[in-house]
Amino acid sequence: MTRRQFIPLAGIAATAGYASLKLQKPPKLSDGPPGNSAVSIVRARSYSEDLVSHMLEGVRQCGLEARGKRVLLKPNLVEFSSTTVINTDASIIAAAVELFHRLGASEVKIGEGPGHRRDTLDLADDAGYRSTIPKFESLFTDLNRDDVAPIQGFAGEPEFYFAKTVLAADLIVSLAKMKTHHWAGATLSMKNFFG
């Protein structure tokens, strides 16, 4: 085959391959309607209390089953200043890791992708995550740098891209930090899945 014969054939093959990829629909995030979210509020007077026991009480109130599931913990890590408390405290995350291991989760990961400061590991260090959470580096994924995959879209969009760590999780637990917010008044948990 000559070069003149090869180039048009290669172009046709590449176009056909690209077209077949575009015709495949990306997977859906869920096949069914959204389920109900369970919320439990359990009081701990300080971060030095037995947080695992408090969390276990909350999980039981919600009827949450974690055995054999891949769990992704999503803290709220924005930026760090020693004069503010805007991030999920490291002791909360450490307790949640221990809790889901005790409950038989097959895997527990921590995933975060801050929108303000882009060096997530430096931010995690400043917030005390690496020094407080056992095996932090092996548990943590920077969602800003994670590989992504498309899912079937909604609201008129053909598809959305999500971090593969998020898509691989059977259970995503928001460990949001309740705080005031200059636009919304209070953030509660509504913004925690943005970054």
What role is predicted for each listed range?
Residues 1-195:
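N-terminal and secondary-structure boundary signal
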